[in-house]
A protein has these predicted regions:
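Conserved ASCE/P-loop NTPase catalytic core
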Residues: 138-312
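Short acidic, hydrophobic short linear motifs in intrinsically disordered regions
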Residues: 32-44
Length: 436
């Protein structure tokens, strides 16, 4: 798979990366591995052998590298002779690699992509409006019970890739909505393992957020084809995670969360529960959301870079909006979506689905018993049926009997989920934000 935004390199000059950085990466990789075939060097550095050959020849002339005969790896069969050779560093080469590691970056991995080339790549992957339809969105949402006007607003936000503020009581599907949005983000994207700005390296790929896409990978092995990322940051989010993180020991940077979310979705979950006050967190995003660019500092050199801010930002909270945000915040959110409690009818449909999913015979009378005898004025939640049926099945397994819906089993499951001793902790429609 050839990327359309940047060309796979054929010569060293095509990398647009400093020659001494590539030389250092090559020598340190070989010193760390003792010996590698030409094909293995291609794999480790993500580069065609032809791009490395000028540096290898230079290292051989200066006696920093030696050859150890032909490799017997199956992958080298039929390849040119230099690719089939095994390479190692000499004692002088090992000393030179150690000197490089002591003063230069210690990054090891595929060769970084030039930052300007990366900008072309990411911009090519976020163009125009997203192709999201009502039927496709409903299919992605699956069995999640939402009113049509809520679905319409989610669709509008996705088509425009606009900022989104989702609020509502816990347990009604806010997190599920953001997860399902990923299914409609569009075709997979290509991202580099790392990028370089001069002699500074920033690691971009993160296996936590970047899921390898199915199918053929790019010819350019500096890149990886991944599903569009959904980066979720919860109550643990700190402002430092939105800046480049410099590893002083290994002398390279880790990309911040919003960079890793580029061309995807960045979700601020549990908004209002972070240590940083909500308005201060919002202020960090005002310029990026409005200008579509973010400014980041390379702390080791003092340089500043301008990064395209091409992720869709979603703020999600189960705290009371009236006590959490102000008019200025809401003005900057393109879409404000309240996810309410399910109606009794929707609650019944969810209960039926959970019974089918968990292998319990459904009884229509169970809905009336739950609503009239157990819930009373207690607010319904979309997550309750799953928990109730799971507890019912647990207790049936404990008694070694088949699970069934009855007043007794429903009452036991209800008490397990909502022990009366918890009082208002299980009844408050809205939680209050922490005081920062």
């Amino acid at each position: 798979m050839q990327t359309g935004a940047i060309d796979a390199p054929k010569r060293l000059e095509d990398l647009h990366v400093r020659r001494d950085l590539v030389a250092s990466l090559l020598l340190r990789t070989l010193a760390f591995s003792d010996q590698l075939s030409g094909a293995a060097l291609e794999t480790r550095l993500g580069l065609p052998f032809e791009t490395l050959l000028p540096i290898i020849e230079e290292f051989q002339k200066t006696q920093l590298m030696d050859t150890l005969g032909f490799s017997n790896e199956p992958a080298v069969e039929g390849r040119p002779i230099p690719v089939r050779m095994n390479y190692t560093v000499s004692s002088a080469g090992r000393q030179r690699a150690a000197e490089m590691s002591s003063v230069q970056t210690r990054y090891l991995g595929p060769c970084p992509v030039n930052f300007e080339d990366y900008l072309s790549l990411v911009r090519s992957q976020v163009t125009g409006k997203a192709n999201v339809t009502d039927s496709a969105l409903k299919k992605a949402l699956g069995t999640l019970e939402l009113e049509q006007h809520v679905i319409d607003q989610i669709g509008g936000a996705m088509v425009s890739r606009a900022s989104l503020f989702i609020f509502g009581a816990p347990g009604n599907g806010k997190s599920t909505i953001t997860e399902r949005m990923a299914l409609l983000m569009g075709a997979p994207i290509e991202i580099p393992h790392a990028v370089s700005i001069g002699d500074e390296i920033i690691r971009v790929i993160d296996p936590v957020y970047h899921k390898i896409a199915e199918g053929e990978q790019p010819i350019d092995r500096r890149l990886v084809k991944v599903e569009r990322p959904v980066v979720v940051a919860g109550g643990e989010l700190k402002l430092q995670q939105l800046d480049l993180t410099y590893d002083a020991s290994n002398r390279y940077y880790e990309a911040p969360l919003q960079w890793k979310a580029n061309a995807g979705v960045f979700v601020i979950d549990d908004f209002g529960r972070q240590e940083v006050p909500p308005m201060r967190l919002l202020n960090r995003f005002i310029v990026p959301m409005e200008k579509k660019v973010d400014y980041l500092d390379l702390s080791a050199s003092g340089r500043k870079i301008e990064l395209p801010f091409l992720c869709q930002v979603v703020f999600s909270t189960n705290l009371s909006p009236t006590e959490l945000v102000d008019e200025a915040f809401l003005r900057r959110m393109a879409y404000k979506i309240g996810v309410g409690n399910p109606s009794p009818e929707a609650f019944g449909r969810i209960l039926r689905y959970e019974c089918d999913r968990q292998g319990v015979a459904f009884d229509e009378k169970a809905i009336g018993y739950l609503l009239n005898n157990l819930y009373g004025k207690k607010p319904l939640r979309g997550s309750h049926p799953r928990a109730l049926i799971a507890r019912l099945v647990d207790l049936a397994n404990y008694r070694q009997e088949p699970p069934k819906l009855s007043p007794q089993t429903l009452k036991e499951a209800f008490d397990a989920c909502f022990n009366p001793a918890l009082g208002s902790l299980t009844e408050d429609d809205w939680a209050r934000p922490a005081i920062n």
